[in-house]
């Protein structure tokens, strides 16, 4: 037998032993025999180095150290999950799923423990592991290929056959409790750093630049799903996981089906009771709608899937003493109390600070400085004060007082009453917030505003980290975001961290930031409660900064996922004279927003008179009543002028009286007319609806999306089609105009072929969009 033949035999045998040991939990040989085979292979490869291949079991020991990790863009974003902390949260999730699917019978869910580790992506091409990456921010992660190759139960080559040419496997790298204990014991014996908990140990081990260190750590991998795949590998989530297991991927041994939310709750309770006896740390349970077609139908909300949720376990709690309460100043000027605690370990982490949120929370707790309190890590991450232990209160405990002057700049601190709004009306009190009135004259607010403005997801000005921003502010070089565009080379060269080359690069990055998208610019402004997704909705729907600035709160609620609270935050931000001045300065610096344009067509055609009436919050008049009213009185002016007789012909007496009473108030008349006038000015008034719809190229057509699209998500594809006037349906029928089919298309594609419906693959679809002036 040749050395090459024996090497191939040994690799195949060792791969099979690894599969049986790590995936099936059925060891086929004693450890000593495995070690003998491994050492034989290692010796043969040393004698014949030209026969060493990347997928050999001997190549898990690590290679040369890296200087830094390179970035990897996820073709399919690695989204985070929404959380449920109470049974009511999970039941509400179940209700939304049932409502979204509109199907009879219990929904089938997959259930598994939520490992407390680090999410990673493993990319296989033709069965070979070619890349490993961290989750990062969900869009961009770090290339940790060398490190994941050292994790013992990650197959370097897939088992069996039939795997797709491209297969991205996603899962969690973690450290078992036993492995963690062994690692810490070894670290302590060697005089090295010990880790607070298994998650920190796993994360720190996986992100080592020297993969030899990673190889020495007891890391494990558990698969929980897939990302990009070149062809379908199943029609259910559990089916996909079972197929991955057949190809050598370790999956959770606790994976189960559940028929409906009550069975999910039973699973959650069972895992919770066994939590401490499990060989690994978990912080909850993950439930996913099992049927993949149902997942696609439910889709996503912002950066979370609507078909999955993580039900978290209650956090671990400890007692400690409040040594002091200090006040921090945030980006919006909010003065927030923070408890300084006698250090205590909670769930393996030393906690010395805890959030107190606001003064109302301090009042609710009855907290005083010197008190003994119960703290917990909410969601196992953020320390919170839960309760004061009154029987341990010392005689010298002191009440907490809000500073009258800002602890940073000395400006006055004002108390602002918060209110909960209901469709334009101020209702119940939501407590109060204390704010420093110094705005950008306050160093803390200015620094946080600039840090947010230059961040990667905002204006993406490379070279300006927190320390650099603090230095520029402390040196008096910037007093607002607009001052960044006035910086000169001579001002920054020589500052700490800025040599000639880095100074030039920073100025180039600042100049490059003058061409942002509208969404980035809106997000960079730091509007309270406006994150990336909301900024994208504003930009995509309204199309221009001017419309966003002018929009009334009630008009903003017509946009997807924007409620009245957020709408008022947006409106109030742009009404503020100081903010207007900052925006004027930014635009005067040469800022050119790159994608301003018209109102989104689907948004322009989405409003109706009935919808507007329903949003006015007239007592007892909901969407159905509004439809009845508009069927009788087809204009706002007719409704305002209607007497009781006209109104009672459309509505029940109680509703008719409510409408008449509402419009007796001149302020309500003005509000309704202002809303209508703005809708008309924006081109989204119902009188424009027919004209807008008829003028779109796909008006009256029904399209269907199926399979996995690689160049865009299905939600984005749906938005593109709807912007052209098409209706996007979930099933194929004789009325379907066209089907867009990506890899993995199944029954819908077959149905289209059967009915003779036109089918476009993704390339043809992208070409079609380009012909309509839409670039992907």
Swiss-Prot record:
<feature type="binding site">
    <location>
        <begin position="80"/>
        <end position="81"/>
    </location>
    <ligand>
        <name>NAD(+)</name>
    </ligand>
</feature>
<keyword id="KW-0862">Zinc</keyword>
<feature type="binding site">
    <location>
        <position position="288"/>
    </location>
    <ligand>
        <name>NAD(+)</name>
    </ligand>
</feature>
<feature type="binding site">
    <location>
        <position position="312"/>
    </location>
    <ligand>
        <name>NAD(+)</name>
    </ligand>
</feature>
<dbReference type="Pfam" id="PF03120">
    <property type="entry name" value="DNA_ligase_OB"/>
</dbReference>
<dbReference type="InterPro" id="IPR003583">
    <property type="entry name" value="Hlx-hairpin-Hlx_DNA-bd_motif"/>
</dbReference>
<feature type="binding site">
    <location>
        <begin position="31"/>
        <end position="35"/>
    </location>
    <ligand>
        <name>NAD(+)</name>
    </ligand>
</feature>
<keyword id="KW-0464">Manganese</keyword>
<dbReference type="InterPro" id="IPR001679">
    <property type="entry name" value="DNA_ligase"/>
</dbReference>
<keyword id="KW-0436">Ligase</keyword>
<dbReference type="Pfam" id="PF14520">
    <property type="entry name" value="HHH_5"/>
</dbReference>
<keyword id="KW-0234">DNA repair</keyword>
<feature type="binding site">
    <location>
        <position position="135"/>
    </location>
    <ligand>
        <name>NAD(+)</name>
    </ligand>
</feature>
<dbReference type="GO" id="GO:0005829">
    <property type="term" value="C:cytosol"/>
</dbReference>
<dbReference type="Pfam" id="PF00533">
    <property type="entry name" value="BRCT"/>
</dbReference>
<comment type="similarity">
    <text>Belongs to the NAD-dependent DNA ligase family. LigA subfamily.</text>
</comment>
<dbReference type="Pfam" id="PF01653">
    <property type="entry name" value="DNA_ligase_aden"/>
</dbReference>
<feature type="domain" description="BRCT">
    <location>
        <begin position="693"/>
        <end position="776"/>
    </location>
</feature>
<dbReference type="InterPro" id="IPR012340">
    <property type="entry name" value="NA-bd_OB-fold"/>
</dbReference>
<dbReference type="GO" id="GO:0046872">
    <property type="term" value="F:metal ion binding"/>
</dbReference>
<dbReference type="InterPro" id="IPR010994">
    <property type="entry name" value="RuvA_2-like"/>
</dbReference>
<feature type="binding site">
    <location>
        <position position="442"/>
    </location>
    <ligand>
        <name>Zn(2+)</name>
    </ligand>
</feature>
<keyword id="KW-0479">Metal-binding</keyword>
<dbReference type="GO" id="GO:0003911">
    <property type="term" value="F:DNA ligase (NAD+) activity"/>
</dbReference>
<comment type="function">
    <text>DNA ligase that catalyzes the formation of phosphodiester linkages between 5'-phosphoryl and 3'-hydroxyl groups in double-stranded DNA using NAD as a coenzyme and as the energy source for the reaction. It is essential for DNA replication and repair of damaged DNA.</text>
</comment>
<keyword id="KW-0227">DNA damage</keyword>
<dbReference type="GO" id="GO:0006260">
    <property type="term" value="P:DNA replication"/>
</dbReference>
<keyword id="KW-0520">NAD</keyword>
<keyword id="KW-0235">DNA replication</keyword>
<feature type="binding site">
    <location>
        <position position="172"/>
    </location>
    <ligand>
        <name>NAD(+)</name>
    </ligand>
</feature>
<protein>
    <recommendedName>
        <fullName>DNA ligase</fullName>
        <ecNumber>6.5.1.2</ecNumber>
    </recommendedName>
</protein>
<dbReference type="InterPro" id="IPR013840">
    <property type="entry name" value="DNAligase_N"/>
</dbReference>
<feature type="binding site">
    <location>
        <position position="406"/>
    </location>
    <ligand>
        <name>Zn(2+)</name>
    </ligand>
</feature>
<dbReference type="GO" id="GO:0006281">
    <property type="term" value="P:DNA repair"/>
</dbReference>
<dbReference type="InterPro" id="IPR013839">
    <property type="entry name" value="DNAligase_adenylation"/>
</dbReference>
<feature type="binding site">
    <location>
        <position position="436"/>
    </location>
    <ligand>
        <name>Zn(2+)</name>
    </ligand>
</feature>
<dbReference type="InterPro" id="IPR001357">
    <property type="entry name" value="BRCT_dom"/>
</dbReference>
<keyword id="KW-0460">Magnesium</keyword>
<dbReference type="Pfam" id="PF22745">
    <property type="entry name" value="Nlig-Ia"/>
</dbReference>
<dbReference type="InterPro" id="IPR018239">
    <property type="entry name" value="DNA_ligase_AS"/>
</dbReference>
<dbReference type="InterPro" id="IPR036420">
    <property type="entry name" value="BRCT_dom_sf"/>
</dbReference>
<dbReference type="InterPro" id="IPR004150">
    <property type="entry name" value="NAD_DNA_ligase_OB"/>
</dbReference>
């Amino acid at each position: 037998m040749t050395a090459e033949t024996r090497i191939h035999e040994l690799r195949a045998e060792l791969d099979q032993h690894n599969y049986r040991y790590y995936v099936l939990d059925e060891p086929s040989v004693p450890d000593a025999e495995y070690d003998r085979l491994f050492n034989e292979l290692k010796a043969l490869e040393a004698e014949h180095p030209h026969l060493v291949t990347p997928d050999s079991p001997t190549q898990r020991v690590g290679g040369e150290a890296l200087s830094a990790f390179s970035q990897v863009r996820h073709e399919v974003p690695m989204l985070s999950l929404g959380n449920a902390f109470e049974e009511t949260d999970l039941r509400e999730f179940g209700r939304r799923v049932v409502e979204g699917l509109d199907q009879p019978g219990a929904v089938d869910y997959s259930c598994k423990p939520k490992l407390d580790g680090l999410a990673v992506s493993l990319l296989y091409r033709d069965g070979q592991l070619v890349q490993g990456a961290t989750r990062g921010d969900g869009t961009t992660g770090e290339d940790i290929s060398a490190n994941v190759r050292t994790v013992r139960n990650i197959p370097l080559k897939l088992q069996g056959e039939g795997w797709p040419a491209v297969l991205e496997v996603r899962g969690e790298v973690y450290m078992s409790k036993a492995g963690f204990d062994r690692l810490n014991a070894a670290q302590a014996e060697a005089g090295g750093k010990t880790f607070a908990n298994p998650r920190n140990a796993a994360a720190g081990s996986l992100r080592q630049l020297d993969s030899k260190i990673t190889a020495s750590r007891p890391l494990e991998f558990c698969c929980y799903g897939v990302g990009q795949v070149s062809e379908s590998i199943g029609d259910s989530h559990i089916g996909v996981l079972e197929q991955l297991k057949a190809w050598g991927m370790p999956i959770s041994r606790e994976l189960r089906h559940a028929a409906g939310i009550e069975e999910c709750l039973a699973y959650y309770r069972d895992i919770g009771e066994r939590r401490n006896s499990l060989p690994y740390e978990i912080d909850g349970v993950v439930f996913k709608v099992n049927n993949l077609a149902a997942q696609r139908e439910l889709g996503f909300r912002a950066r979370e899937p609507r078909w999955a949720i993580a039900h978290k376990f209650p956090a671990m709690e400890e007692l400690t003493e409040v040594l002091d309460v200090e006040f921090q100043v945030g980006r919006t000027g909010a003065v927030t109390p923070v408890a300084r605690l006698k250090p205590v370990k909670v769930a393996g982490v030393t906690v010395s600070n805890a959030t107190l949120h606001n003064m109302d929370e301090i009042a609710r707790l009855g907290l005083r400085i010197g008190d003994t309190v119960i703290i917990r890590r909410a969601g196992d991450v953020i320390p919170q004060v839960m309760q004061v232990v009154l029987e341990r209160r010392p005689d010298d405990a002191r009440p907490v007082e809000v500073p009258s002057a800002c602890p940073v700049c000395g400006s006055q601190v004002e108390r602002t009453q918060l209110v909960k709004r209901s469709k334009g009306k101020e209702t119940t009190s939501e407590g109060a917030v204390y704010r420093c009135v110094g705005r950008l004259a306050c160093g803390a607010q200015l620094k946080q505003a600039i840090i947010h403005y230059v961040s990667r997801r905002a204006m993406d000005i490379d070279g300006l980290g927190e320390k650099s921003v603090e230095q520029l502010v402390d040196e008096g070089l910037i007093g607002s975001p607009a001052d960044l565009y006035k910086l000169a080379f001579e001002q920054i060269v020589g500052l700490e961290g800025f040599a000639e080359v880095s100074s030039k690069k920073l100025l180039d990055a600042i100049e490059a930031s003058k061409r942002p998208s509208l969404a980035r610019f809106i997000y960079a402004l730091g509007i309270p409660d406006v994150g990336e997704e909301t900024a994208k909705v504003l930009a995509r729907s309204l199309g221009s900064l001017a419309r966003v600035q002018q929009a009334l709160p009630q008009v903003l609620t017509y946009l997807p996922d924007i409620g009245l609270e957020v709408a008022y935050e947006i409106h109030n931000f742009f009404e503020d004279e100081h903010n207007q001045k900052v925006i004027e300065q930014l635009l005067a610096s040469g800022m050119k927003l790159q994608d301003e344009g018209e109102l989104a067509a689907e948004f322009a055609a989405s409003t109706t008179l009935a919808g507007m009436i329903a949003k006015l919050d007239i007592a007892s008049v909901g969407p159905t009543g509004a439809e009845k009213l508009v069927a009788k009185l087809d204009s706002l002016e007719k409704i305002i002028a209607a007497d009781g007789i006209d109104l009672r012909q459309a509505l029940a007496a109680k509703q008719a009286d409510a409408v008449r009473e509402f419009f007796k108030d001149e302020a309500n008349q003005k509000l309704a007319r202002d809303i209508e006038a703005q809708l008309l000015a924006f081109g989204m008034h119902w009188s424009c609806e027919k004209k807008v719809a008829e003028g779109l190229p796909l008006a009256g057509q029904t399209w269907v999306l199926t399979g996995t699209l690689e160049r865009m998500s299905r939600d984005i594809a749906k938005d593109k089609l709807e912007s052209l006037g098409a209706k996007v349906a979930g099933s194929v029928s004789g009325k379907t105009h066209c089907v867009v089919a990506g890899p993995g298309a199944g029954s819908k594609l077959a149905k289209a072929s059967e009915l003779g419906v036109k089918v476009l693959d993704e390339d043809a679809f992208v070409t079609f969009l380009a012909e309509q002036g839409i670039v992907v």
